[in-house]
Structure formats: structure tokens, C-alpha cells
Amino acid sequence: MISREELGAKSAELGVDPSHVQQDYVAGWILAGLYGESPLGRQLVLKGGNALRKGYFGGTRFSEDLDFAITDRVNPAAFLDALNDVGRLAQARTGVQFHLEHTAQIGRERIKGAQTVYTFGMSFTDFYGRTETLPVSLHMDVTELTRLHLSPQSRSLIHPYSDHADCTADLTVMHLDEVLADKLKCLLQRQSIRDLFDLSHSILFNDEIPIDRKSVVSTFLRKTIFSPSPAAALNLLAAIPFEGMQGQWDDSIVCSRETRQDLTDTVTRWKDELRQLFADFRLGEQGQLAFFPAHLRTPIMDAGAQRKLLRLTYKGRTRLVEPYALRFKRREDGIGQEYLFIWDRTGGRSRPGIKSLLNYRIDDLAITDEPFEPRYEIELAKAGELTERPTFSQGPRHRTHTRIATRRPRPRPRRR
């Protein structure tokens, strides 16, 4: 284990709390054990923030979790056994005191179809030996049945501590272009300042590894519903309101003083960079009508996150609705469009219930102050995923070639 003096010096050098340095140090040893000693390492693909920090850019932000993809099913019991084996190994080599009796599966979430994310937790004693504080925890998310669009890469573990010669392993890491494609997708779905940081650090400020911008965007388009209309994705990305997120930037980004950038400058440069990222793709208006534009999408996403009702005017009627999902669906004639699935409290021509709405028939939309208790899972954070479920409960359909709406449909003649 690194000494308390090294821990304090590293914390002071980087300008981060010692707890983040402890987590980062232990994460390195867990990765070294998984990929260097455990058979489980042959199945795991490191992704997310620590794929960047431990596999590509040692100077990027700290990430408190380890995220893995696996193309097969997860065996929770086998994974727990492997974690405890790795914990015992790391404890013997470093002196870090793990609480292996508390290693556990602490979460399970079905995200789409049969795909599930399992969350596991390990804990260890604070390096300063403070028994009055809770043990420091390290979480690991494992997503099973993951489809990888690019071949993973082998990268040497980045472990910026004095025992780096002993803490070594060749990590299997998600391809850098796919990591950044995932960050673009998540940027649209959750509008997280951390995703902006990861993208800007990797694409704007990185001078270590060349970035294949075309590969990043083409992978992003294949992983989302926006392949038919790159322009729709570009416009949505450009409209994310980062300017109001200074507090999140200051509080949630844990990185060295040297790495931290000014948010205003980062946003300005990022919006300029977006045009360059999409420069090789067709950016006409063709197909944009099929997707909810930013001025509707942003309040819909906010209402779902806050569990607040929306008031909107649809086909000339004012409605009070509960928002649940944005899904890209294909009609029987092959036309594909994005639909907003809501519970309509007002009714209209029919009784209150589940309805699907098209963006170009909405005239006004605003978040109310009235909360609601969800009747279904709110799936708005999954907007943009490639899934075609016709109802809330039914499983995903197989993908097929889909045409998209390119103009407003002609109104049907009224019968007299």
C-alpha cells in the first residue's frame, strides 16, 4: 500500500480529496487482479470513465466506479467469488484491508429486453486507519449481453503510483472510438456534465492519442436511432443547455488542477467541434421531422426526471399528461418516426389512457409544478436507443430496414 505521506502528497499535487486517490489506487489493484490473475478477465471489457482513465488517458477525471461489458450472461455468484479472490490478492500485496465479508451484489437493473446490469460492491478500510468513518466503497457495474460495434483494444494498466511496477496488467478495454460514441449517446440521453468533460478532454485537449472523428460519429449513429438523420443528432447535441451547469461542473468533476478547464471556454470549443465531428455526414433537412426537436425534447426529459406533469396542445386540444418514453417506431407502411408515449389525463376524443404523440402535432408544451406518481417505468433516459417496443410491457422487436418521415403527412379529407 502506498504510504500515507504519498497519499497526502498526491492529493495535494492534484488538488483532490484523499478519498478519490484511495479509490483510484484500489481500482488499479482490482483491475490488475481481474485481468492478470482471474479467469474472469478474459470475459470482461472495461468501459466508461475508468476505461478512459485506466486505459487511455491517465490525466483525465477520476471515476468512482468500474464499468464492464460482457457479451455473455453474468453469473453473479461466480463474479462475487472472483472479486473476493482478487481482494485477497490485493490485500496480500498492498496491505489494504478489504472487508470481504461485505462484498455483495447490491443492484440489478433490466435495461432492455433480456439485457441486465448487475452492480457489485467492495469495501476497504480508510488508508489513515480511521475506524470512526465508514469503510471506503468501490462499485462495479457489469452489463451482460453487450453488443460491441468495434473490437476491444488491449491497453496497459495506467497506475500513477510508486508501486506501479508491481501493479501491472494488459486490460481489455472498449475501443476508444466506441467509448466516445457511448459518451455522445449518453450526452443526449442524460445531458450529464461528466460526459461533456470526457468528450472534451479526449477530443479537444488530448494530445496523446489521435482520435478518428469519423469513426466516433459513425459508431454513435449505429448505436442510436439517428443513422437516417445525422443532422437531427447534431442539432440536439448543439442545443444541450450546458451554460446553466456551472455548479455541476464545479462539484461533480474530480480532476487535477492541470486538467480542469473553464466551462464557458469548453462549451464554446465543443460546439465548434461538433460541426467538425459531423462534417463527413449528410446534414440536410431530410428526415429531421421524424425526431423530437430540442425545444420539445428538453422539457420532456426534464419533466420525466422531475416527475412533473406536462401541459401541451395536441391537434388543437390542451392536455395534461404524464411523460414516459420517447421511442422510434415503424408503422405498417415502413415510415419510421419518434413517438412520445404519455398517459393522457385529459382524454380528448377518447378516455384518459396511454397515447403516442408526434412532435409536429404539438403546438405548445410546458412543464407544470404538479408532480405525478408514475404508473409505469419512466424510460425517457433511454431515448435514442435502438429499440422498437410497441407497448410498455412487450419486448423488443428485431431491427429491420426503416424509412423515416421526411415531411408532414397530408391531412385526410373529412367525410361529409
Task: Tell where the protein language model's regions lie, with residue ranges.
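Structured mid-to-C-terminal alpha-helical surface segments
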Residues: M1-L44, K54-L66, I70-A294, R407-R416
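Glycine-rich beta-strand-to-loop/alpha-helix junction loops that act as flexible
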Residues: L46-N50
